[in-house]
Swiss-Prot record:
Residue ranges, annotated region (Disordered): 64-96
Subcellular location: Nucleus
GO molecular function terms attached to this record: DNA-binding transcription factor activity; DNA-binding transcription factor activity, RNA polymerase II-specific; sequence-specific DNA binding
SUPFAM superfamilies: Homeodomain-like (SSF46689)
UniProt cross-references to Pfam families, sorted A to Z: HALZ, Homeodomain
Chain segments carrying region Leucine-zipper: 177-198
Cysteines joined through disulfide linkages: none
A GO cellular-component term linked to this record: nucleus
Keywords: DNA-binding, Homeobox, Nucleus, Transcription, Transcription regulation
Protein name per UniProt: Homeobox-leucine zipper protein HAT9
InterPro entries per UniProt: HD, HD-ZIP_Homeobox_LZ_Class_II, Homeobox_CS, Homeodomain-like_sf, Leu_zip_homeo
Gene coding for it: HAT9
Gene3D superfamilies in the record: Homeodomain-like
Length: 274
């Protein structure tokens, strides 16, 4: 029993009579081992010389968990036996790499299960985290040995712990910033009200006319009349003088108010008229 009897694969493309030999189907049927011969034949429709053999015993079923590695390794074995030589170093390295990657994937799937720690392990991890939030490889190895865990599990726990600490600190900062924003909003509203009140007061202020001091002075004739009237009053009754203060300075030519009335006759002194 040779290799050709255990694995007969065929692919025929053609027009006209099938080039398959007559003893092809008989050789396949005479083999007593498991059939591993998936066959595909393309020809003209209605050709009676082509027969497609199908059967449940001709299918090779493999488990899903080992399909990748087994198919790859079997393919390499078939190629090596067909070529009649040994694999090159590059091919051997590729085969080992695929197998190692497969085993790593299996370990990764098993490692994805949630790790349940005891109270003692959790307490020791918390104490270690308080001392050092990050661990170097040596500290990681020592701690993993103490906890009877793998270094990768210790590293993942520290990563998750740092993430939770950062999240809590972010929440605290967010609450503080919210309070600051509320305080600033209230202060802004208060300042806006004060500005509005100041604008209202500015618009409702009474109108005052600014009069310069020169407009409150008397002409020379009025000054003479006022001075003469005060002199005629003499030592009789006391006369009071009222000074008009404009812009912090006394106006020139203060108005004199005498205690006794003085009557002026313009006909007797025509030059005294203004």
């Amino acid at each position: 029993m040779g290799f050709d009897d255990t694995c007969n694969t065929g692919l025929v493309l053609g027009l006209g009579p099938s080039p398959i030999p007559n003893n092809y189907n008989s050789t396949i049927r005479q083999s007593s081992v498991y059939k591993l011969e998936p066959s595909l034949t393309l020809c003209l429709s209605g050709d009676p010389s082509v027969t497609v053999v199908t059967g449940a015993d001709q299918l090779c079923r493999q488990t899903s968990s080992h399909s990748g590695v087994s198919s790859f390794s079997s393919g390499r074995v078939v190629k090596r036996e067909r070529d009649g030589g040994e694999e090159s170093p590059e091919e051997e390295e590729m085969t080992e790499r695929v197998i190692s990657d497969y085993h790593e994937d299996e370990e990764g799937i098993s490692a994805r299960k949630k790790l349940r720690l005891t109270k003692q392990q959790s307490a020791l991890l918390e104490e270690s985290f308080k001392d050092h939030s990050t661990l170097n490889p040596k500290q990681k190895q020592v701690l993993a040995r103490q906890l009877n865990l793998r270094p990768r599990q210790v590293e993942v726990w520290f990563q998750n712990r740092r993430a939770r600490t950062k999240l809590k600190q972010t929440e605290v900062d967010c609450e503080f910033l919210k309070k600051c924003c509320e305080t600033l909003a209230d202060e802004n509203i208060r300042l806006q009200k004060e500005i509005q009140e100041l604008k209202t007061l500015k618009l409702t202020q009474p109108f005052y006319m600014h009069m310069p001091a020169s407009t409150l002075t008397k002409c020379p004739s009025c000054e003479r009349i006022g001075g003469g009237g005060g002199g005629n009053g003499g030592g009789g009754g006391g006369s009071g003088a009222t000074a008009v203060i404009v812009d912090g300075s006394t106006a020139k030519g203060a108005f004199s108010i005498s205690s006794k009335p003085h009557f002026f006759n313009p006909f007797t002194n025509p030059s005294a008229a203004c």
